[in-house]
Amino acid sequence: MHFPGHSSKKEESAQAALTKLNSWFPTTKNPVIISAPMYLIANGTLAAEVSKAGGIGFVAGGSDFRPGSSHLTALSTELASARSRLGLTDRPLTPLPGIGVGLILTHTISVPYVTDTVLPILIEHSPQAVWLFANDPDFEASSEPGAKGTAKQIIEALHASGFVVFFQVGTVKDARKAAADGADVIVAQGIDAGGHQLATGSGIVSLVPEVRDMLDREFKEREVVVVAAGGVADGRGVVGALGLGAEGVVLGTRFTVAVEASTPEFRRKVILETNDGGLNTVKSHFHDQINCNTIWHNVYDGRAVRNASYDDHAAGVPFEENHKKFKEAASSGDNSRAVTWSGTAVGLIKDQRPAGDIVRELREEAKERIKKIQAFAA
């Protein structure tokens, strides 16, 4: 423990090296590894194990925030699970260290309820952060500034209750708006990411430094943190993201095969057997169309492993016929047409292991890679 005025030179050096993320999340270790709030995958146990290993673990909070929604019940259950896993069940007033919640804002019918239904759950369970993503641009444009359910109103309400706010973006334009709305952390997600994302964007190699430069230039009055997401699966990718200007690194696909994740076995198998992600994953609106998922605005699409349904689509099979095959396969237990969200780094993922081990391995790999780079530059 650090006491002002009683620190050694070594301790003073360590303190000087702390980043803004470290100050907000004192249990984190550098480089900061963050597990993404993947819907139906990122549960409380997974988040807790990431936190215990010195990372930041996010629990998926869903997208339906209307009173009585099953998403609300599941969120409360998973946060209680995280508290239990962290050994804090008998300390209900202690904040959950290194734990956050992810909320999808594209369901315009339910976003006005966030502060009425989600916020009380967050206050009760005390995660440290909230990650927002996919606000509907039409809803934002048609609403009065700060109206209920807008990003700005939600961020202000979260700040008033003491939460650090992450906001996921895919363009510099959206990063600017998120920062103007008050976000503390910009999650700069590149198009190599798995799952939902901006339909039009770039990879983190250009996105992260341009977002960082914009924030330094236009938001000088406060420090807005940037973390990178998309296409990272090992320590080499972590170092690359840090070199681009990120203060922390988000991984999604790597954690889908963590032992603690809620990923079904057939999807784990798909992830572990897929390689050459640039060829064998596809970024498209088709994945939501075949799933009949209608809540997503068309500015968002998603990246998933190429499968029989997509191959038929690419070959020109009419959607009605393709969807019939999709439903018949699902009803017969054939998962070859099911959507498995995945990023392009899927080919780097070779095994299933505990989430804490993944975090520690990423951190050590990154440190070793940094040493090698320093040797090259000497």
Curated annotation (Swiss-Prot):
Subunit annotation: Homodimer.
Cofactor(s) needed by this chain: FMN
Organism: Neurospora crassa (strain ATCC 24698 / 74-OR23-1A / CBS 708.71 / DSM 1257 / FGSC 987)
UniProt keyword list: Flavoprotein, FMN, Monooxygenase, Oxidoreductase
Catalytic residues in the record: H196 (proton acceptor)
InterPro entries registered for this protein in UniProt: Aldolase_TIM, NMO
Keyword match Oxidoreductase: yes
Family: Belongs to the nitronate monooxygenase family. NMO class II subfamily.
Full protein name: Nitronate monooxygenase
Reactions this protein catalyses: ethylnitronate + O2 = chemical entity + acetaldehyde + nitrite + H(+)
Propeptide: 1-15
